[in-house]
Amino acid sequence: MDMFEINITSVIQLMSFFLLLYILKKFLYDKYFEVMDARKEKIEGEIKKAEQLRKEAEELKKEAKGELIKIRESADSIIKKAKEEAEEIVNNAKKKAEAEAEKILVSAKEEIKNEREAMIKEVEQRVGEIAVVLAMKILKGTLDEKAKREYLMKILKEHEK
């Protein structure tokens, strides 16, 4: 017997095997590989899309950080400006209050001076009147009319000086 003896059964089996391979390839393997290739392409597409989205997200994150820095700088600038304006307002109000206080003080001193002068005049006038009355009472009985008048005139002249 030969090792490679060919008989009809072997040929039919071999043909059946190749026919089965052809049918499997045509209906199963091709479809399977089409599905697998489509799935592979879809996965690769999703990976590329995810990578693109990640890059876009990183860019947006960088832009957001830049905007946040600009906003913080702007806010700091606004706060600094507001503090400076508030300080200026306070200083102006303080200066205005000091000027007003000085004005009131000068006015009060002037008023006190005027009142003092008025009181001095009034006191001098009353002193003169009282002196005349006292002199009249003292002299009532001791001097005659002419002497009284002369004495009163002398007192009034002294008082006016």
From Swiss-Prot:
GO CC annotations, alphabetized: plasma membrane; proton-transporting ATP synthase complex
Signal peptide: none
Keywords attached to this entry: ATP synthesis, Cell inner membrane, Cell membrane, CF(0), Hydrogen ion transport, Ion transport, Membrane, Transmembrane, Transmembrane helix, Transport
Entries under Gene3D superfamilies matching the protein: F1F0 ATP synthase subunit B, membrane domain (1.20.5.620)
Protein location: Cell inner membrane
The keyword tRNA processing is annotated on this UniProt entry: no
CDD domains, A to Z: ATP-synt_Fo_b
Membrane topology: Single-pass membrane protein
Any Pfam family: ATP-synt_B
Record field: transmembrane: 10-29
Keyword Transmembrane helix attributed: yes
GO molecular-function terms, A-Z: proton-transporting ATP synthase activity, rotational mechanism; proton-transporting ATPase activity, rotational mechanism
Known function: F(1)F(0) ATP synthase produces ATP from ADP in the presence of a proton or sodium gradient. F-type ATPases consist of two structural domains, F(1) containing the extramembraneous catalytic core and F(0) containing the membrane proton channel, linked together by a central stalk and a peripheral stalk. During catalysis, ATP synthesis in the catalytic domain of F(1) is coupled via a rotary mechanism of the central stalk subunits to proton translocation. Component of the F(0) channel, it forms part of the peripheral stalk, linking F(1) to F(0).
Record-stated family: Belongs to the ATPase B chain family.
The name this protein goes by in its record: ATP synthase subunit b
Native organism: Thermosipho melanesiensis (strain DSM 12029 / CIP 104789 / BI429)
